[in-house]
Amino acid sequence: EMCIRDRIHSVAGKLGKNTSLIAIRPFRSPHHTISQVAMVGGGASPQPGEISLAHNGVLFLDELPEFSRNVLEVLRQPLEDHRITISRAKYTLEYPANFQLIASMNPCPCGYYNHPTRHCVCHPGQVQRYLNKISGPLLDRIDIQVEIVPVPFEEISKSTPGESSASIRERVIQARQIQAQRFAGQAGIYSNAQMTPSLLHRYAQPDAAGLELLRHAMHRLNLSARAYDRILKVSRTIADLENSTDIRPEHLAEAISYRNLDRENWAG
């Protein structure tokens, strides 16, 4: 993993002569004014783009709707294939691009749409145009979609501590160990997110009650087949975090709740 990361950074001219192996997974946070070429790679002198520099790491896009629509749409295929193929008149290149996409955004241009106490000053058309910058197919590829609400003063000032980051980290490590054991005989597969359809059928099948819950959600939210697979993968991970062998209905319900930005619910 480190060798591949070093090769990518070397080709991009971002590895110093006396630099040893990069031992930390990358975290890339490009500005929203980035061009399509800078994001995916290419150019007159071909170089890897941000999605390849984030290989085996995180690509963080702050203020997602502020990015160019073309830049966002070009992310769709790499999110599926974990690589990017760049074809030009003089060359065809393929770079690895197995990154974890994390994005943030405001609910509207002013930032107060659906706010419990502040008044949104945006016209409904402005809100819709703002949200429409994120296409349905791109949103479909985002496994966990969470709407953050303002934290009231009473919660901030509570003396009772919540779960510590160290405790959460320990649970995540244990879940990754469970997945490593599960896929020990599967070449190139190390986590639930990488499950093929056959592995999904083998390791992420809910019981009858869970299937009924999922069927209802699919019809109610008008979810796609891609969303169906991703809900199963997320619910399998939730079960792993609870050290549960089976996927229970509550695991599915939590995974379904993470689809709350799907197109049916946007802009009211």
For each feature predicted by the language model, list its residue ranges.
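Short, small-residue-biased leader/transition segments that mark boundaries at the very start
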Residues: 1-4
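Post-Walker A helix-loop "phosphate-sensing" segment adjacent to the P-loop in P-loop NTPases
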Residues: 7-16, 81-83
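Inter-lobe coupling/hinge segments of SF2-like helicase ATPases
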Residues: 18-21, 71
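Conserved alpha-helical scaffold flanking the Walker A/P-loop in AAA+ ATPase domains
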Residues: 21, 26, 37-59
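Basic, amphipathic alpha-helical bundle interface domains used for macromolecular binding and assembly
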Residues: 45-46, 69-268
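Walker B catalytic acidic pair
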Residues: 56, 62-63, 74
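Residues immediately C-terminal
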Residues: 59-60, 66-67, 153
